[in-house]
Amino acid sequence: MNLKETFHAFKESDNFFVSLARDIITVLLAVLIFASFSQVVFGMWTPMVAVESGSMEPHMNVGDIVFIQSIDRTQVVTYEEGMDNYNSFKNYGDVILYKPYGQEGVTPIIHRAMYYVEEGEQMWEGGPAAPHAGYITKGDNEMTNRYYDQQGQVSYMMPVKEEWVIGIARYRIPYIGYLRLMLPGF
């Protein structure tokens, strides 16, 4: 039997184990294609996160899947800079995904980059000097995020260093993230 005949027999077989192998190969190919596409377009193998809180409402909701573009592929546009002619998710500037305090293994925060401060510069009007350069960030939800992250528990007194930024939110798909939120550790 030549290769063409073997492939045809594999493709047409009704045997349970052959059918199972076919399904597994199909899923693996789909994952490989998606991962390759993600790497090319977004610069990341897994370019998405599920929104876990309402801090970005009404522009991102709990359960949304958000596609993230690697910070290596783009530059952050802050709210302050975006006021001229740029917005994302119905507001000025970029929404960034960052590691709080640069820590690994903690849930990343997805909030809007409001402006950039240099070391020693006031972090906000009447506020303390920045201990290092970085972004001042804030969630879009005015009910839950009245203050900058750096004024509260999210990133207290610490501007978000550029190396803490994982990427920039580019697209969202509503509700799909609930699947990920229902499966802890996934």
Across the structure, where does each feature detected by a protein language model lie?
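Secretory targeting signatures
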Residues: 1-39
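Extracytoplasmic/periplasmic terminal helices and flexible tails
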Residues: 2-17, 46-49, 72, 84, ...
